[in-house]
């Protein structure tokens, strides 16, 4: 039976917070089908996680997606609804928190933005990444959706009509607050203490935060599961498809290259022509990727241009494409299937100069 429903705005977030519950031994199911019916989760599912893929949508559409799922959860009688937010405050923060409030008709939405283990903390309502304000961090330098503010009520207020209150570590939560309440936290102990207080007051039926909150919530609300001490995964290799422009991710890819992985880039045509992968040239590209993978099954496909290169930009210019067109169409490579001897991939590749996903099937 579903005890907690989580709503994340992207697949990475769905996984990095869902796994916090799995670590506690809980049965977690992650779904990407927005029409998925909760009764189909089965009696053994304790935590159901929806990936709405709404981070890069306009605020209204993001609101609608989150509202529909939260409303479904409320009508189904799920005890706890958790809005998973980005630890760097990207995405449609205000509209999605507002959607949870409206769908559940709860009076207050507690928001815990901190992720202390990752050095992401909130102090006096201001969010910090590695000791600097979020607007001055890598999230503020995001080339697509930079976080331009650091005071969280200001960020929420861009998309929400709700009252927003901040509560410092030295201040008390009375239980009479309305709207969205942002809690300071600089350690996991801060998160646990505050969340425990709200739980005892019956004010934690809905909640919001990132993986930092997810990591402490099972203990706070006494969600129990059986931890499997003998879990292993056997694999003959690893295929990574990266489209992130985040500096940390780029460093991780470089580290992997230096430790045995082979990296292959994509041409501008492969990235921006949504019909490419169904063409003869596209099928040949598949074959080349397969052959390279067979040479080294620790393999990275990187959709970013080489450092200091503008080849994709120049290609788009020559083809009379512009960024607004890629925003409208999301330069989707479509959903394509190909059997590669004894292995198959179904890849849903969304090129927005930032994102692509390739998943084994």
List the model feature ranges, each with a label.
Residues 39, 101-104, 108, 282-298:
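Short amphipathic alpha-helices and their capping/turn segments at secondary-structure boundaries
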Residues 2-44, 112-117:
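N-terminal basic/disordered segments at the start of proteins
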Residues 45-60:
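Short, structured active-site "lid" loops
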Residues 14, 28, 77-83, 202-205, ...:
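Hydrophobic alpha/beta core scaffold segments
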Residues 129-285:
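Conserved, well-structured core segments that form the ligand-binding/active-site neighborhood
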Residues 1-3, 31, 46, 62, ...:
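Cap/lid and interdomain-hinge subdomains that line or gate substrate/regulatory clefts
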Residues 17-19, 92-96, 120-127, 193-197, ...:
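Short acidic, glycine/serine/threonine-rich loops at helix termini
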Residues 7, 49-51, 83-84, 110-115, ...:
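Short beta-strand segments
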